[in-house]
Every structure is written in structure tokens, then in C-alpha cells.
């Protein structure tokens, strides 16, 4: 997306998340003139977008020539001259197929951005821990576990794993509703 890598030709885009990032990437690549093949291990492309958004996005991508293949996982990527040889494995049957493309792009989510949480953890009065039983019971899950520390700390959203904004807000609501 930064424009530092100039992709052209045939691009195999593997989407492990089924959300916006891979589809935006497919759009950018198609607009650059690439032939894009979107691959998903899931039963449906863009399964996390919901029916309203996915219908519009998939229509727009299809009109740009993007093709979609489901139930496929990447088994191997090997260099073949200046191209890539990609072995796909069908997730239900185990059958493999080999494809040669110019580029492979893999969307597998983000690495948690949890450095601030870990920096603050020892200074919090709950050591960054939440009471899972209390949270399940709909009670305040933030409980001090030591006298030291002047604040309660919880980790949520992208500090845990790649999440969409709705999941992060739901985390925050469940954890903070009783504060």
C-alpha cells in the first residue's frame, strides 16, 4: 500500500482473515493493472464482511476481473526463475494443484500491538489480569490483586490479536461497563 513495491502481472492473493484488508489490496492491485486471483481457505470469500458489504465489494472486484477461489490453502511457494510456483491444497479433499504467478501476497492479520500493555502491566494494581469468571457472569472483571499500582489495566482489541473495530468495542464494553 505504501507504493514501495511495484507489483505487476499475475498476483495470487491469499486471504486468511476474510475481512477488508485483503479485499482492499485486491482492489489496489487490480487498479494497477494486475491480474488478481483471490484465494481463501474458507467456504466463502469475504465471510467477515456480512452480506450487504460483501455483495458490493465482490461485485466491484469481479467487474475489475478479480477471480475468487475458496476452500484452498497454500501448501508451498517456491521460486521458479523470476516467478513463483504455488502449490494449493483443497482443505476438504487434500487434492493439490500447482500454479505459476508473478507475485504472492498473503493477508494473515496483524501482529498484536501489545508493547504498551506489557510496559504498564507491572505498574498496575491488577497486573493486567481480568477475572474471567466475573466477566462471564456480567460482573466487573477488573479487580486489584496487589496493593501497589495506581490503575487497573486490561488488554483488548489489537493488543490481543488482529480484530475489527466492532470486536474491540465489544471487548471494551464487556470489560469496562462496571467501572
Where do the model's predicted regions map?
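Glycine-rich dinucleotide-binding loop and its adjacent helix/turn
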Residues: 1-33, 121-164
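A Rossmann-like FAD-binding core segment of flavoenzymes
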Residues: 7-8, 31-135
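Generic hydrophobic/packing signal
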Residues: 8, 16-17, 22, 79, ...
Amino acid at each position: 500500500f505504501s507504493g514501495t513495491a511495484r507489483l505487476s502481472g499475475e498476483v495470487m492473493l491469499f486471504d486468511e482473515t476474510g475481512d477488508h484488508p485483503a479485499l482492499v489490496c485486491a482492489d489496489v492491485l487490480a487498479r494497477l493493472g494486475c491480474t488478481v486471483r483471490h484465494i481463501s481457505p474458507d467456504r466463502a470469500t469475504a465471510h467477515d464482511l456480512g452480506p450487504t458489504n460483501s455483495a458490493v465489494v465482490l461485485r466491484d472486484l469481479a467487474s475489475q476481473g478479480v477471480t475468487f477461489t475458496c476452500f484452498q490453502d497454500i501448501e508451498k511457494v517456491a521460486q521458479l526463475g523470476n516467478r513463483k510456483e504455488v502449490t494449493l491444497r483443497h482443505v476438504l479433499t487434500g487434492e493439490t494443484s500447482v500454479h505459476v504467478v508473478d507475485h504472492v501476497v498473503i493477508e494473515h492479520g496483524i501482529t498484536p500491538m501489545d508493547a504498551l500493555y506489557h510496559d504498564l502491566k507491572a505498574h498496575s494494581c491488577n497486573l493486567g489480569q481480568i477475572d474471567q469468571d466475573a466477566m462471564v457472569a456480567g460482573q466487573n472483571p477488573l479487580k486489584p490483586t496487589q496493593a501497589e499500582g495506581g490503575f487497573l489495566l486490561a488488554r483488548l482489541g489489537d493488543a490481543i490479536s488482529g480484530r475489527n473495530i466492532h470486536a474491540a468495542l465489544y471487548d471494551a464494553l464487556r470489560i469496562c461497563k462496571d467501572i
